[in-house]
């Protein structure tokens, strides 16, 4: 690493220099702490003083210190106090509540060359993401966590069977508080030891790639945990954070990174590069991007110019270094060109969560049938801006916590009546332009909100409503994967049209999606009464195949699945009978 690139914020490989690096017979330690008065590294075999270089870097060789040994820095800061800190660039840590770093060699064992060579950003491919919290997807009988290696035998196969293309893992970087779900970090380069070692994480990623499942990691570039052994006041001064409390503290009580400083930019973007390069992650979903666009995420306070420049520089560098990795923004603002390349004035992301679509859609499905007739615009409005960005439609963990209720519980009505509405909702999600993301448990209509301390309620699958819903979601995902009209022209406005959205009094609408080899269309009745003789005028005639009816008995509905689904010639008109709260999916070739 060129130190000038470190100070100016241009380096992406700071982890190659900083941190603990073993050599034959010992370990080299290096840490940046410009205002420190003295630093020593305490190891299992003794304490070693670091010496300060002219570049404000402290370093030393520690003979006899080997991989697997625990260490921490004692930093006497500018205020004269000595505080124990974990290594900012440490690549492994001990389990909370302990906060020591562990000397760790680079993980080995990847066997995914073919996957890495052939992966794409999926612009014209299916992208159906399963969001997972590793500690609570499944747990052992005694309530303990599965390890990365143990999950390698379970999670990729489950995703493959259920029609998901990628797993998105809530933050794996080491964090002290389970209830933060990983979003308040102390060890940015260290996979959490809750689930095992870095080598075991490699085993998990290998298993995913072997099954054809991509791995996207949540990445937190905005803020960090306030725990004293972490980054806060690392050298006795606000080094990684803003000195002013007005902008230095986030709404979550954590410390905001000072992105205007080159060394901090280098730290964050090197961390992003580390997860992509060392662990073969297929993408990063960047958390709380609105806080990087506007001061404290508030448009009324104006654009934060320095963080915008950081974001552009980081994304441009990551795109160059990892051209097939997927960069996703969790951004609730209307700031333009989030998914445009930096060279064209954009922020350089590949995708952006469509949180407007999510809010409007769920608000619509919370309403009674009568109220829906007056609010069809909540479903149609998203198409007014659908082509402005590359969107992902998210039903994330945020919509399953804090009293918001799970997706199925958000549906209007009582228990039995929620399931047909949820089936129609997910068909609407699939036919709407945009890639898809769904949080664990939604696929079998979990009723209980997310709790990081408990595994998902798999026992509900013994009840017919949940088992049928799970079967339906698998069939819908299979239809999505098998029919390229869902995704091959995802961001082409000419490939979409409303077949009907002009009769809100019917609680009905219909959508047409063109592909390269045919089309798919879906018709919906979001009302509580049967809709007979619902007639649609099609853009062209062809051979019609019914792919799916959300009201089929095999999915928990009342309609018997016909024995013959294919080969029906269709002119320019289609006449349907739609059950209450249902949708029907067709393919036309």
Question: Language-model segments: what does each one mean?
Answer:
Residues 97, 280-282, 297-455, 481, ...:
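Conserved alpha/beta catalytic core and glycan-binding cleft of carbohydrate-active enzymes
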Residues 1-28, 49-131, 136-143, 150, ...:
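The feature marks proteins involved in alpha-glucan
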